[in-house]
C-alpha cells in the first residue's frame, strides 16, 4: 500500500521527495510559488507569474509537507489568502492591484499573520467580515455579529491586540447576547487563552467548556464555591 501511495505522489510530481528530510522539518508547502509568497519576494513573484501566465486567482497546490492546521483545513486557499496568512504585504498589494477578489475569508488569514497593516488594508477597501460557519442568522443576530468571528479567531491565535480591537470597536458589551459571550469564553478555554477569563464570566458561561476541555481542577474548584 505504501508503494502505491508513493507512486501516486511521484506521478503528481517527479521531484516530490527531493530534500525530503529538510522539507519535512520545515513543515511548509514546498512549491516554488508558495516559497516566494512566504518570503514576500515580489519581484521574483511578478516575473514568475508573468512568464508562466500563472492565474493570479488560482489556489495553491496542497503539499504533503504542510503542517499548519489552519492551512490544512482549507483545501481551497488562494494565492492572496496565502500571502495574507504570512503577512507578505508586497505580494498582497500586487495581487490586490491586479484586481484579485478580496473575499471575506481574508480577515481570518490576516489575523494569523498578526499584521496590523493588512487589517488596515481590508478596512480601507471595505472587505466584508466572515460569518460563523454552519450558524443561522438568528443565532448571532446582534449588530456587527460578523466581527465576533474575527474576535474568536484572534483569541485562537493569542493575538490579543487584535481581539481587543474587534471587541472595543465593534462588539460593545451592551450588544452582546448570551450566545456571543459563550462563543468568546468557549474559545478562550479551548485554545488556552486566558486573557478574557474572569471567575464570574466562567461561572456564567464556561462550566460546560471547562469540563469538555478537561480543566478538571478548575472545574472542581469553582464547583465548590
Feature roles, as predicted:
Residues 129, 133, 191, 207-209, ...:
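Short, intrinsically disordered, charge-balanced linker/junction segments flanking boundaries
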Residues 4-20, 49-68, 89-93, 191-196:
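Repeat-mediated protein-protein interaction surfaces in helical alpha-solenoids
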